[in-house]
């Protein structure tokens, strides 16, 4: 196993505080993108995200939305490099006192 990701088409309640770019109609929500440590730095996360984007376009989705831990510099840099816009922050008090950055990339 090189990597994994979880995606859904349903928006979790904690995302409702974010002022999203695209309408909340048909969007992809990315959760838990991970690449095995032995395979990091080889472009696998980018490949996974490009695959999700392609599937989103094929399925007429408005955008891809996601969050990542604010202190995860690699993920934050990856999403910015791939054209995602940081739109705000949310908190998961049961996970961390630090915020999670929310990103969106319109597909149309």
Role assignments for model-derived ranges:
Residues 15-18, 51, 89:
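A generic local structural motif
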Residues 1-3, 74:
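Glycine-rich acetyl-CoA-binding "A-motif" of GNAT/NAT acetyltransferases
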Residues 32-35, 41-54, 77-81:
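Conserved acetyl-CoA-binding loop-helix of GNAT-fold acetyltransferases
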Residues 23-27, 62, 69-76, 80-82, ...:
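C-terminal "cap" of GNAT-fold acetyltransferases
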Residues 6-32, 36, 40, 94:
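Conserved acyl-donor/pantetheine-binding loop and adjacent beta-alpha core of acyl/acetyltransferases
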Residues 49, 56-68:
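Conserved GNAT acetyl-CoA-binding A-motif
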């Amino acid at each position: 196993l090189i990597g994994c990701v979880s995606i859904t088409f349903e928006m979790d309640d904690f995302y409702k505080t974010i002022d999203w770019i695209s309408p909340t109609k048909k969007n992809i929500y990315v959760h838990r993108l991970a690449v095995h440590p032995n395979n990091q730095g080889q472009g696998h996360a980018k490949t996974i995200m490009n695959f999700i984007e392609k599937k989103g376009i094929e399925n007429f989705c408005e955008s891809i939305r996601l969050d990542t831990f604010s202190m995860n510099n690699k993920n934050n840099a990856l999403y910015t490099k791939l054209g995602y816009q940081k739109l705000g922050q949310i908190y998961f008090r049961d996970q961390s006192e630090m915020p999670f950055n929310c990103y969106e990339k319109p597909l149309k």
